[in-house]
UniProtKB/Swiss-Prot annotation:
It comes from Candida dubliniensis (strain CD36 / ATCC MYA-646 / CBS 7987 / NCPF 3949 / NRRL Y-17841) (Yeast). The keyword rRNA processing does not apply. The lineage of its organism: Eukaryota, Fungi, Dikarya, Ascomycota, Saccharomycotina. Keywords: Mitochondrion, Transit peptide. Belongs to the AIM9 family. Residues 1-34 form a transit peptide. This is Altered inheritance of mitochondria protein 9, mitochondrial.
Length: 624
C-alpha cells in the first residue's frame, strides 16, 4: 500500500488586477506531486479562486491545512497543530522591503519584526519594477514544518518554511535562530552546499504573522531515490550504495574539521545573552567578517523540546547549556535531569487531578525511577581520559553534530553537485556521544557473512532466509558507513567499537524517547551494562574504579522489566501503524476507510478492524 502514497501540492498564483474594484485575485491549485522537488503542477489540478485582499476567505484556508496524512487518535487536534497560516499580503510586502536594503555581510538586520541576511539579497534577482510574489506552491508537508515554493516576478524562486506548532513558542524561536546560524556557518565558514537563508522570523510578530525561514530554492531530485538498502550483493549494488553513502560521509568529514570551545548550539552573536557574547566559538579565525559572527548558546537538541510542553521554560533553561568543553559530565547528566523534571511535572499534574487515570500515574512513577538510575550512572558511562580508547581526547572535543544527515535531506542539483537541507536540532557535542545517521544505523544482531555466521542458512525456507538477509544487509550498510568514517577520520574510528556503543547506549536511548513507554529501552540499556561492568572498570573504559555496579537491581525488578519490555515490543510489532505514532498517509487512510478496515469510533478516533484486513489482503504489487 505504501506504493500508493503521493504528496499533494497546492499552488496559489497571483493574477492580474480584476476590473471590479482593482482587487488582486488568486487561484488555489491542488495537484499530485511525486518524487521530484520541482515537478510542475498537474494539468488536471482543481482550482479555487480567492481575493488576496480577503484574508478571511474560507476557501483560502485549504492552502494552510495539513493534508499529507491522518491519525488514528486525536486527528483533529494534531492537524490543527500542523496548520501553517501566514499572511500572503505580508509576505509580498516583506520581500519588497528586503529589496530596498543594502547588500552587506553583517549581523542579521532587524526588519518589521523579522531578520534579514542582507548579504544574500541577490536571491531576489533583479528588476526595475517592484518585486512581487507571482505564485506560492505547497511542495512538502514534513514532520516538523511545511515547505512552500515562492515564485517572484524576477524569475527567481525561494523556499518558505513554516514550522508546525508542536513545541512552545520559546522552543520554536530558539530552534529557528540556531538553525539559521548553523546554515550560515556551514556556508560561509566551511563553504558547503547548503541553501542560503534570506530572512527569518522567530515568532508571529512580523509581516508574515508566523515564524518562518525564507531561503534559497534548490531544484533537483532527492538522493533518496538512489537509496536501495536491501539489494543483494553485487558490483552494481556496491556502486549504488556508495553513490549515496559517500557524499554524506564527505559532508560529515567537513563538518568535523572544526573543533569548538563549548558544548551547546550555534547562534548569531546578537541572538545569545550578553554573558555569552564575549566567548568566541572556536579558535584561529582569521577572517575579520566572521570572527564575531557566531556564538555558542543553549543546546536545541530535541530532548529539550520534544514532549516538554508541560515544562516551564525557566526549568528547561537550567539544563540546556551551554557547557564548558571540559564538563562532559554536565552534558551527559542534562538528559537525565530534563527527563526527570518533565516526568515529575506530569506526575504533579496527575496528583492534582482527582479523575486522573491510575495507570498513567504508575507509568510516570516508573519513568522517574529509570531517569534517576540514568542520572546516577551518566557521570560514570565513559572515561574521557581512558588509555584503552584510541584518540580519546579527539573523541571528546566539541564538534558540530547534525541529527538529520539523510538522503531524504540531500538534493541532487546536478549529477555531481549535492545540496544538503534540514539542520534543525543541530548541536555541538563530543563525537563519541553522537549516533550514526538513521539511514545506515543498525542496533540489531550483526551478520557479516550469511553462510559463516548463520548455521544451516542454505537449507532454510525462503521466508526464514529473508529474515537473515535483512540483518545482513543492515549490517553491511552500517559497515560501509564505518569504512568511510575510517577513510576520512581514522582518528575518530573508535566510535565503531561495540563496547563504546554499549556504554553510550543509555544516553542515546534517552535522546530518542518519543512516547511514555520508551523509558523501558533506557532501563534496558543500563541493565545491559551490569554484566560487563567489572571488565569495563578493569580496562578503564568507564569513569569509575568501583567494580560494584552503581545501580542495585533485584531479581524481581529485572524479571518485571524484561516482561514489560517484551510486552511493549510485542505491542509495537502487532499494533498497526504504531511505528508512525498512528499516522497514516492520506490516500492509504482514505482507501482503508472505504474498505471498512478503518472504522470511526464514538469519540472520533479510528480503530482497525482486523477481520476486514483478512478480507482485503494487499495485492502483490502493494506488497512490493
Amino acid at each position: 500500500m505504501l506504493s500508493r502514497v503521493a504528496r499533494y501540492s497546492r499552488t496559489l498564483n497571483q493574477l492580474t488586477r480584476t476590473s471590479q474594484g482593482g482587487l488582486l485575485s488568486a487561484v488555489l491549485r491542488t495537484s499530485i506531486r511525486q518524487n521530484s522537488t520541482d515537478s510542475p503542477p498537474s494539468n488536471s489540478a482543481n482550482e479555487i479562486y480567492t481575493k488576496l485582499s480577503d484574508t478571511k476567505d474560507p476557501q483560502r484556508n485549504q492552502f494552510f491545512q495539513y493534508t499529507w496524512g491522518s491519525w488514528l487518535t486525536n486527528d483533529k487536534s494534531k492537524k490543527k497543530q500542523r496548520e501553517t497560516t501566514f499572511s500572503i499580503e505580508g509576505l509580498t510586502l516583506f520581500i519588497d522591503r528586503i529589496n530596498q536594503l543594502e547588500s552587506k555581510l553583517g549581523q542579521p538586520k532587524s526588519l518589521e519584526g523579522a531578520f534579514v541576511l542582507t548579504n544574500n539579497k541577490e536571491l531576489l534577482g533583479s528588476t526595475k519594477e517592484k518585486v512581487i510574489v507571482r505564485s506560492i506552491a505547497s511542495i512538502h508537508e514534513g514532520k516538523h514544518h511545511r515547505v512552500y515554493k515562492i515564485t517572484l516576478n524576477t524569475g527567481k524562486d525561494l523556499v518558505l518554511r513554516i514550522p508546525y506548532k508542536l513545541d512552545s513558542d520559546a522552543a520554536i524561536a530558539s530552534k529557528l535562530k540556531s538553525e539559521v546560524a548553523t546554515i550560515d556557518f556551514l556556508k560561509l565558514k566551511l563553504g558547503l552546499n547548503v541553501p542560503r537563508v534570506l530572512a527569518y522570523g522567530v515568532d508571529s510578530n512580523n509581516e508574515l504573522k508566523s515564524p518562518f525561514i525564507l531561503q534559497e530554492f534548490i531544484s533537483g531530485e532527492l538522493l533518496m531515490k538512489k537509496w536501495h538498502p536491501l539489494l543483494p550483493d553485487s558490483e552494481e549494488t556496491n556502486k549504488n550504495l556508495h553513490e549515496v553513502i559517500d557524499p554524506i560521509a564527505q559532508f560529515q568529514d567537513k563538518i568535523l574539521s572544526v573543533t569548538f570551545k563549548k558544548f551547546g548550539s550555534l547562534y548569531f552573536h546578537d541572538d545569545v545573552e550578553g554573558s555569552l557574547q564575549n566567548d568566541v566559538p572556536y579558535e584561529g579565525e582569521t577572517d575579520s567578517t566572521l570572527s564575531n559572527r557566531w556564538r555558542i548558546g543553549p543546546s536545541v537538541e530535541r530532548q529539550f523540546t520534544r514532549n516538554k510542553s508541560k515544562l516551564q521554560q525557566s526549568i528547561i533553561d537550567q539544563y540546556n547549556g551551554p557547557w564548558d568543553a571540559s564538563n562532559t559530565t554536565a552534558l551527559l547528566e542534562s538528559v537525565a535531569d530534563i527527563e526527570l523534571e518533565n516526568a515529575k511535572s506530569k506526575l504533579a499534574l496527575i496528583n492534582a487531578d482527582a479523575g486522573a487515570n491510575e495507570n498513567d500515574k504508575v507509568l510516570i512513577t516508573k519513568q522517574i525511577k529509570t531517569f534517576e538510575n540514568l542520572k546516577k550512572i551518566s557521570p560514570q558511562l565513559i572515561n574521557d581520559k581512558s588509555k584503552s580508547i584510541m584518540n580519546v581526547q579527539e573523541l571528546f572535543k566539541p564538534r558540530l553534530y547534525i541529527p538529520d544527515l539523510d538522503p531524504l535531506n540531500v538534493i541532487q542539483h546536478t549529477e555531481s553537485e549535492n545540496y544538503f537541507i534540514d539542520f534543525e536540532g543541530s548541536t555541538i557535542k563530543p563525537f563519541i556521544l553522537t549516533s550514526y545517521p538513521k539511514f545506515v544505523a543498525y542496533q540489531g544482531a550483526k551478520i557479516y557473512n550469511l553462510e559463516e555466521d548463520v548455521p544451516g542458512y542454505k537449507e532454510m525456507e525462503e521466508l526464514e532466509k529473508q529474515q537473515y538477509d535483512f540483518m545482513y544487509y543492515k549490517t553491511r550498510n552500517e559497515r560501509m558507513w564505518e569504512l568511510e568514517l575510517n577513510k576520512y577520520r581514522h582518528d575518530l574510528i573508535a566510535v565503531a567499537s561495540p563496547h563504546i556503543k554499549v556504554l553510550k547506549s543509555p544516553y542515546l536511548q534517552a535522546l530518542d524517547i518519543k512516547n511514555g513507554k520508551d523509558y523501558l529501552y533506557v532501563e534496558g540499556s543500563i541493565v545491559q551494562l551490569q554484566a560487563m561492568w567489572e571488565a569495563y572498570v578493569a580496562n578503564e573504559l568507564v569513569n569509575s574504579k568501583d567494580t560494584k555496579f552503581p545501580i542495585e537491581y533485584t531479581a524481581e525488578y529485572l524479571d518485571q522489566h524484561q516482561q514489560e519490555l517484551s510486552d511493549y515490543q510485542l505491542e509495537t510489532v502487532s499494533s498497526p501503524f504504531s511505528a508512525t505514532g498512528g499516522w497514516i498517509p492520506q490516500d492509504m487512510f482514505d482507501t482503508l476507510k472505504a474498505q471498512g478496515i478503518l472504522v470511526e469510533t464514538k469519540d472520533g478516533d479510528y480503530k482497525v478492524e482486523t477481520e476486514k484486513v483478512l478480507e482485503n489482503p494487499p495485492s502483490p504489487s502493494e506488497e512490493k
